[in-house]
Amino acid sequence: MTKVVIENVHAREIFDSRGNPTVEVEVTLSNGVVGRAEVPSGASTGENEAVELRDGGSRLGGKGVMKAVNNVNTAINNELQGADPFNQPAIDKAMIELDGTPNKGKLGANAILGTSMATAVAAAKATHQPLYRYLGGTDLSMPQTFHNVINGGEHADNGIDIQEFMITPVKKTSFRDGFEKIVNTYHTLKKVLEEKGYETGLGDEGGFAPNMKDSEEALKALHEAIERAGYVPGEDIAIACDCAASYYYNKEDGKYHLEGKVLDGDQLAEYYDKLLAEFPELISMEDPYDENDTEGMVKFTQSHKDRLQIVLDDFICTNPRLLEKAIKEGAGNASLIKLNQIGTVTETLETIRISRKHGYNTMISHRSGETGDTFIADFAVATNGGQLKTGAPARSERVEKYNQLLRIEEQLGDGERLDFFPAQD
């Protein structure tokens, strides 16, 4: 039998859910199989993320990605022609070495990641397996999903500084049953907001973006929506927040400028404690401190780790080295996993491996600038990721991930069930 190799790698410039250019890559194998992947991009980005190569200049507001596209079509294509598509680590290593920079700044993480993902898709097709099975083998589970239903911070033009208010099902059940609870709560939330006189326009991730005065008001609306949908807050549906505290951290004075208050690290913890006391169904907080405020993050972790999932995003940027540093320092107890923060499938898997080794939960994540690509849905199942956040049950680029999970659950049958945080009987 003739050995299957990579025959061609081709990229093009497409557009994401915010109308910004992004990279699409197609990897064609010698047997004619084609794998395609589309690269997302974030609005709220960490300082240590791999470099998303943009063109600059006047075209498309400087956001064009033709430099990254050309890097795929020339340097990366030349490097990978004839390579083994089934050896993902070797493919990714070759691109990392070809780039030669610590942050993928020469070729662009968007160029490298698109190729990395498309290679995995092509390899799965060539072996006649679903992507989740190719990447994960037989060790699979459906993820617990977190849905951003009220948007603030960088994701919406309103008065709320905390970036995301999410709802998540917390009773062990099928994915479909849990998702239906989320959909019911989402539609009820719209009614609650309308009755209170708020606009119900949508933010980048499909959640509502009401012009509320503070985060407490947003949490009250969520609590009411959960109850009015017929569920018990904390027992059926819980709440999670992505604070994205770097958004309201002032580097000049080292204080947090949050909803009209100027707070130091201890005062910020007191602010969060007030919310946690009022809303016991709040079970998870992401980036509660700035990515450079190690002292604040560590202190908050030590005092809250038994009560709360503390998710590290900007603090680690899906980077194995930064994660190991955070673990050593005692920061957080969960890792947010974004493929485009680090730039290859292999490095992302390594970050997940390190997280699991040290008892950290993992939450696979979309970006605010998304496409219809469903790679992360398969990836969450394949990696036993436990958790996945990919927006509200609205906007096709978000819902398509959930529809893919419905298909996967149907294929897996009744054997695989959600593994919830916190564990529920």
Swiss-Prot record:
Would you say which domain of life the source belongs to?
Bacteria
Question: Record's SUPFAM superfamilies?
Answer: Enolase C-terminal domain-like, Enolase N-terminal domain-like
**One GO BP:** glycolytic process
Pathway(s) served: Carbohydrate degradation; glycolysis; pyruvate from D-glyceraldehyde 3-phosphate: step 4/5
What keywords are annotated for this sequence in UniProt? Cytoplasm, Glycolysis, Lyase, Magnesium, Metal-binding, Secreted
Q: A single Gene Ontology molecular function, please?
A: phosphopyruvate hydratase activity
Q: Any note on cofactor binding? A: Binds a second Mg(2+) ion via substrate during catalysis.
Residues annotated for (2R)-2-phosphoglycerate binding in this entry:
Q163, K338, R367, S368, K389
Q: Which cysteines are joined by disulfide bonds?
A: none
* Enzyme active site: E205, K338
What PANTHER family does its record include? ENOLASE
Q: Name the chain's protein.
A: Enolase
Q: Which species?
A: Lactobacillus delbrueckii subsp. bulgaricus (strain ATCC 11842 / DSM 20081 / BCRC 10696 / JCM 1002 / NBRC 13953 / NCIMB 11778 / NCTC 12712 / WDCM 00102 / Lb 14)
Gene expressing this chain? eno
